[in-house]
């Protein structure tokens, strides 16, 4: 019943994108194209002022795009030099436009508003990028790390260039998908931001590490291990991201009819309802595939370039917070990533908590707040 409406919307979105490509290509990245009010669901309680900006950025295959972000200002008069900026890289909400953080707000409302409200109360302005294709024309290349880094850096560049009350000094903070985005941002912030910005460091909680290793066995004979429905949703989002970034792979040809149907459903369903639907239908990951993904030539190399976290090249301090009861990411892999960074002489510190994936976010604040304060000191 919704297919004709969706098809029409996609057609209009594509036409809109094509009509605007010359403008996007001519606009320097990190430029505000428009600014307006945020929906109530996306407005952080306690913010003295909030806005939604559209800005120029980069998406898959270095194509120019328009992305969106929410900007939150703390109460009171800004200090000399402007409010220091926290770039908030949010966790997975879905890949459809209706799921965008600056449109629908967070999926974990109480958790995220408590977390961001704490940063706001410390005198930081917050710039929350949606990532390319979320809430704006085009597809969202889910977990494409370099694209996420571009989007986060360009959002900060756009906001600080547009609002004179914001400082050029900034740090990035992220959770889950956003922690991966924060780590990629940490690797490329100085390069992508250039002399216009003063990048100071990064915080990541629940960081998904070495996903490229975890995805290698996916295929029709994956054992029916009991997984969270949200984990199956993540797989579908990753497959959609690969389809967007590497159309030549013909990802659909590796899927069963049911797999292709779920891939299509995941394109528009946000995380929580998609997880509920997958759980209600008792979907098993192996049932999605008609042949192993490992048949893709150089699959591990391709995945590493797409979503593998960089193991060196960081020029500012990194804070990794990990819950020891976290089952949304593979905790031993995150701990291994921290150990690899330390062995490689990277400026990282690891903090662990007796919490799950979600609980670690606010539990980390007693450690991450002073860490970030020192970055701006």
Residue ranges of model-derived segments:
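Catalytic-loop region of hydrolases
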Residues: 3-7, 22-78, 342
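Short beta-strand element of the alpha/beta-hydrolase
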Residues: 68-71, 81-94, 98, 103
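Alpha/beta-hydrolase active-site loop
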Residues: 115, 142-163
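Primarily recognizes the serine-hydrolase "nucleophile elbow" in alpha/beta-hydrolase
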Residues: 157-229
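Short alpha-helix in the alpha/beta-hydrolase fold that links the catalytic acid
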Residues: 185, 316-318, 330-340
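Accessory cap/linker subdomain of secreted extracellular hydrolases
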Residues: 206-309
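C-terminal catalytic histidine-bearing segment of alpha/beta-hydrolase fold enzymes
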Residues: 292-303, 328, 335-377
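Short beta-strand/loop motif that positions the catalytic acidic residue
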Residues: 314, 319-326
């Amino acid at each position: 019943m919704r297919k004709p409406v969706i098809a029409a919307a996609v057609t209009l979105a594509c036409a809109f994108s094509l009509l605007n490509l010359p403008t996007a290509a001519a606009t320097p990245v990190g430029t505000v194209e428009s600014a307006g009010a945020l929906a109530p669901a996306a407005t952080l309680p306690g913010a003295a002022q909030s806005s939604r900006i559209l800005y120029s950025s980069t998406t898959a295959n270095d194509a120019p795009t328009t992305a969106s972000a929410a900007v939150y200002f703390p109460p009171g008069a800004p200090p000399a030099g402007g409010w220091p900026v926290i770039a908030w890289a949010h966790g997975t909400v879905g890949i459809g436009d209706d799921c965008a953080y600056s449109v629908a707000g967070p999926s974990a409302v109480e958790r995220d508003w408590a977390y961001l409200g704490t940063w706001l109360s410390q005198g930081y302005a917050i710039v929350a990028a949606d990532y390319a294709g979320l809430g704006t024309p085009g597809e969202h290349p889910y977990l494409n790390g370099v694209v996420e880094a571009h989007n986060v850096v360009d959002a900060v560049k756009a906001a600080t260039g547009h609002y004179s009350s914001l400082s050029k000094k900034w740090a990035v903070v992220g959770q889950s998908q956003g922690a991966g985005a924060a780590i990629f941002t940490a690797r490329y912030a100085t390069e992508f931001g250039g002399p216009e910005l003063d990048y100071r460091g990064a915080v990541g909680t629940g960081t998904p590490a070495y996903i490229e290793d975890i995805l290698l066995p996916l295929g029709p004979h994956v054992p029916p291990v009991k997984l969270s429905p949200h984990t199956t949703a993540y797989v579908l989002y990753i497959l959609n991201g690969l389809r967007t970034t590497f159309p030549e792979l013909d990802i659909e040809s590796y899927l069963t009819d049911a797999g292709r149907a779920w891939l299509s459903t995941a394109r528009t369903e946000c995380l929580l309802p998609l997880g509920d639907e997958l759980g209600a239908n008792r979907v098993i990951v192996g049932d999605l595939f008609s042949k192993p993904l490992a048949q893709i030539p150089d699959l591990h190399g391709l995945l590493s370039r797409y979503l593998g976290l960089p193991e060196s090249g960081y020029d500012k301090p990194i804070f990794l917070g990990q819950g020891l009861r976290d089952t949304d990411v593979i905790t031993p892999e995150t701990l291994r990533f921290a150990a690899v960074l330390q062995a490689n002489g990277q400026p990282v510190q690891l903090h662990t908590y007796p919490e799950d994936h979600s609980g670690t976010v606010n539990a980390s604040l007693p450690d991450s707040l002073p860490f970030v304060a020192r970055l701006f000191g």
